[in-house]
Each structure stands twice: as structure tokens, then as C-alpha cells.
Amino acid sequence: MKTIHLSSAGLLAIAAFSLANTSIAATPGTDNADESAYAAGWSSGSNGGIGFKGWNLVLDGQGDAGGFFIGDSKKTGAADINVNSRSFGMFGHDKAKSTDAYRSFDSPLEVGQSFSVEIGVNFRDGNKGFDLRSSDEKAIFNLNVGADDYTVHLAATGAGSIGTDYSNNTVFKLVFTQTSASGGTWTLTRSGGFSKTLNGTYNGVAAGFKFYAAGTADVPENDLSFNNLAITAKK
């Protein structure tokens, strides 16, 4: 019998190949504000649905100027993104602080997987929006609502103003698809009083997200609402 001797470099190459081919995809699943995990409210550690880790809700010293809640997105004149009259909601009125809701997928997206979410907004002062984040907690895509504008930042392609046309019942549906080990595509669909679809690309591997609100006037129309989170299986 012939004995095969492998060098240290060869063993490392095999180990790296094995690791690359046994990576774990994010679990396909959904979450929404009507899940039983939020029956008593929404707080850090809450973990409804499938495919996600628990929420990390950070007030950053805002006190009563910031908060998180489960409520009816229509109550502030915004669009209906509810499931059984329930959506996630948050607010942040302190200009020096930010109200932040962080969450990770149970594993980063693999090539062929997508993540989607619906966001409802009314008033546009201050800053509020959404970050797609990589596993090293870096923002790799941003949608910001502020200064009477809706703007995409940080995207590899497609960044810029979506347009300044105001509608109280604006909904943004965001879909991110991991197309390679180094990036993916995003699609933004606006509905409500105005309709528009934009596309682009992002760099990095999607592993989670952040919603934020800061510096808005103290009126409920400035609440940020979102719902209907979903992770698809590989295609």
C-alpha cells in the first residue's frame, strides 16, 4: 500500500476547502409583530419567528425621548403594514442620541438567499431608517429618511436620492439577495402615494440589520414602523 504524505500547506488547504463547503446558511423563515414572542411587548431579547437571533434594543441615554413598541402603523396616518393590526414601531426625539434596534440572522446569508422587510414612514424630519449590516457589524447599505428626502447611502451602486415627493402612507419594501461571497443586489420598491422601483448592488455578506431614529420632532407622525421580515431559502 502506498502511503501519501501531505505537507502542512496541503492539510490547511483541505481544511479550508472543507470549512467553505460546510458553511451554514441562514435558516429560511419569517417574523412579524403579531408573533407570540411580542404578545407582552417588544424588548431586548425578544425573539419571534424563525431565522433570526434575538433583538438588541438600545436607547443610548434617550430616556423618554426614545422608545420601542408594538402598535398599529395606521394610527399615525401612515400606511398599513400590519399583521392583525400590529407592526414594530420606534421613535427618537433627542438630536444628540439615537434609538437603535439591532438584529442578526441566525447565520449570514449564503449565495442565493434573500432577506426582505417592509418599512412605513410618514413625517421626514430628523433621521430614521435602516442599515443592512455585515458579520463584522459594518453597515453595507443604508436607507435614510430625513431633511424631507428619502436617500440610499453606502450601496456599491444605485446610491442617491429616491426623490423628495411626500406621501403620508409611504411604504418601502427592501429585498437583498446575496449573489456572491463578496456582495449582492438590492431592490427598493416604493408604494403608497407614489410608486417607484430602484435597484443596485452592495459589497459584503449580509448578516443582520439595524433600524434607527434620532432627532425628530416629538409627534407620533415621526414614528418609524416596519414589519414582515423574511429570509428565503437558497435558489
Map each language-model feature to its residues.
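Carbohydrate-binding surfaces in secreted/extracellular proteins
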Residues: A33, V117, Y166-G200
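Extracellular carbohydrate-recognition regions
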Residues: A25-G63
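Flexible glycan-contacting loops in extracellular carbohydrate-active proteins
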Residues: L198-A230
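Bacterial N-terminal signal peptides that target proteins for export
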Residues: M1-G10
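Secretory/extracellular carbohydrate-interaction modules
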Residues: T27, E35-W42, G67, G71-T151
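Bacterial N-terminal signal peptides
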Residues: G10-S18
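Short, aromatic/His-centered strand-loop micro-motif at the edge of beta-sheets
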Residues: T151-K173
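Sec/Tat signal peptide C-region and signal peptidase I cleavage site
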Residues: F17-A25
